[in-house]
């Protein structure tokens, strides 16, 4: 019965969770692409409707990046990546609140994939902005005597970001899904409205945190010390 409530699409895949997550992620990507095409197809000088909402969202992402990186120019430069990932994370989170659907971000495979995209991209940008030697020399710190030790610490610190960013999103959304499943099973239909509101807020919050940390990691990679 529980599977019938939350895994409506599971009947198409034999309750193969990997296939279910992939299906819902492709659905999220399709929705994202549809919205992007719908907004850009008929853009107006004075935005209204969906264009107004998307422009407000992008302005918010730029403001977020400016606070995180200390530069509006850099915030705008990386806005397409951060805004796209943030939107996909939000949709992936929120779709899990619909009975019969499952949040793609409740799969560690997706959260790890998104994290690796950010991880490799900010290192790529750091190397491109500072050069290979200068970028990794920054891992050694200002004191030459302990440079090898600091380098190892920095490498471990950067690798730990993969675990913290991916597991934070995965753990929170998976927990939210299980909580909602229990509430819908034990309580009447109207009672879970408060948990729905709370979980909707958590879906937004987790997407926000993912975007903030992505901007912070990019700032640490590309912002030169003199610019602080």
From Swiss-Prot:
It is found in: Cell inner membrane. One of its GO terms (cellular component) is plasma membrane. InterPro entries: ATP_syn_F0_a_bact/chloroplast, ATP_synth_F0_asu, ATP_synth_F0_asu_AS, F0_ATP_A_sf. One of its GO terms (molecular function) is proton-transporting ATP synthase activity, rotational mechanism. SUPFAM superfamilies: F1F0 ATP synthase subunit A. Key component of the proton channel; it plays a direct role in the translocation of protons across the membrane. F-type ATPases have 2 components, CF(1) - the catalytic core - and CF(0) - the membrane proton channel. CF(1) has five subunits: alpha(3), beta(3), gamma(1), delta(1), epsilon(1). CF(0) has three main subunits: a(1), b(2) and c(9-12). The alpha and beta chains form an alternating ring which encloses part of the gamma chain. CF(1) is attached to CF(0) by a central stalk formed by the gamma and epsilon chains, while a peripheral stalk is formed by the delta and b chains. This is ATP synthase subunit a. It comes from Campylobacter hominis (strain ATCC BAA-381 / DSM 21671 / CCUG 45161 / LMG 19568 / NCTC 13146 / CH001A).
